[in-house]
A protein has these predicted regions:
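Conserved acid/base catalytic micro-environments in cytosolic active-site loops
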Residues: 1-181
Length: 181
């Protein structure tokens, strides 16, 4: 499962991660826009509150069920065909590194129609191309209802591009996650 957000989406994504049970059937990859200038203990805090192991993705680490992987600040997070991560320092995409688009497209190339991707609040259009790419691979694309988003730009951009996306309220997103647990 892929989760992406920027401004206004952090609290909702963190709440979703806190609610994931230890038997959640999918590995989770999270891309949030965060500054490289400020050290963060997001993973450490969430690890204590989630039923899953919450970690910062490490280069060459294999994607595994039972884990939530956060893309590190200032690196694009890619998934290789062997299921391992690569940290990439190429140019920012839409002023963002990590880029939601880059990670979502990379994972879609491997898992295609087996992907569930959810895009939340954000102040850029990053994520919209990745969601379209996943939709084109027949993955399940879920967009936060823009009316529920603190910053509507990101979900609106994805909604404009994705014609088959599920558009869900915050409560509906939680209910959906509960249904696959």
């Amino acid at each position: 499962m892929l989760l992406g957000c920027s401004a206004g989406g952090f609290n909702l994504v963190f709440e979703l991660i806190r609610r994931l049970p230890s038997n959640f059937p999918l590995p989770v990859v999270v891309v949030i826009h965060r500054s490289r200038n400020y050290p963060s203990s997001i993973e450490e805090i969430l690890d204590k509150k989630s039923g899953l192991k919450v970690v910062l993705a490490v280069d060459k680490e294999k994607l595994s069920k039972g884990y939530v992987y956060f893309a590190p600040s200032d690196y694009h997070l890619l998934l290789e065909p062997d299921g391992s991560f690569t940290l990439d320092y190429s140019e920012p995409v839409l002023y963002s590194r990590p880029s939601i688009d880059v990670t979502f497209q990379s994972v879609a190339d491997i898992y295609m129609d087996k992907i569930v991707a959810i895009l939340f609040s954000g102040a850029s259009e990053d994520g919209s191309e990745g969601m379209l790419y996943i939709e084109d691979k027949n993955g399940l694309v879920i967009i936060q209802e823009p009316k529920d988003a603190e910053v509507k730009i990101m979900p609106q951009a994805a909604l404009f591009k994705c014609k088959d996306a599920l558009v869900l309220t915050n409560d509906e997103i939680f209910a959906f996650i509960d249904s696959i647990s």
